[in-house]
Amino acid sequence: MVKAVCVLKGTTGEVTGTVYFEQESDSAPVKLTGQIIGLAPGLHGFHVHAFGDNTNXXXXXXXXXXXXXXTHAGPTDKDRHVGDLGNVAKIDITDKMLTLNGPLSIIGRTMVIHEKADDLGKGGNDESLKTGNAGGRMA
């Protein structure tokens, strides 16, 4: 079993949270649990970004971790970015595309909470296919 933890902190300190990850084996889905506090009411996009460096207010986090040139989508869609995890405040997700092992592991990458709801790639424009129109980064 592989376990990991991500501590989220917003740029102003108001948004904070902790996400816990568990994967029973290389082929098992990843279980995510946790909670984010300090968010405005409503849904907020939640993504794994490609790089782990968030020292420049998350600007260096780049786009969501993607595989095989897929576009942005929802967590239950077959063709999606690996890091597309939908909308959160309280986290209880089991995901078959994430892994904590091997070259596609999300360990060492940045988790980002966005200011708006994620439209899951169904917003009908180019930005929707890249980011889900989830807006700025809160943490």
UniProtKB/Swiss-Prot annotation:
Lipid linkage positions (S-palmitoyl cysteine): 6
UniProt source species: Lampanyctus crocodilus (Jewel lanternfish)
Name of this chain's protein: Superoxide dismutase [Cu-Zn]
Single GO cellular component term: cytoplasm
Gene: sod1
Enzyme superclass (EC): oxidoreductase
Location (main, coarse): cytoplasm
Reactions that this protein is recorded to catalyse: 2 superoxide + 2 H(+) = H2O2 + O2
Location of the protein in the cell: Cytoplasm; Nucleus
Function text: Destroys radicals which are normally produced within the cells and which are toxic to biological systems.
Residue segments, region Disordered: 118-139
UniProt KW keywords: Antioxidant, Copper, Cytoplasm, Lipoprotein, Metal-binding, Nucleus, Oxidoreductase, Palmitate, Zinc
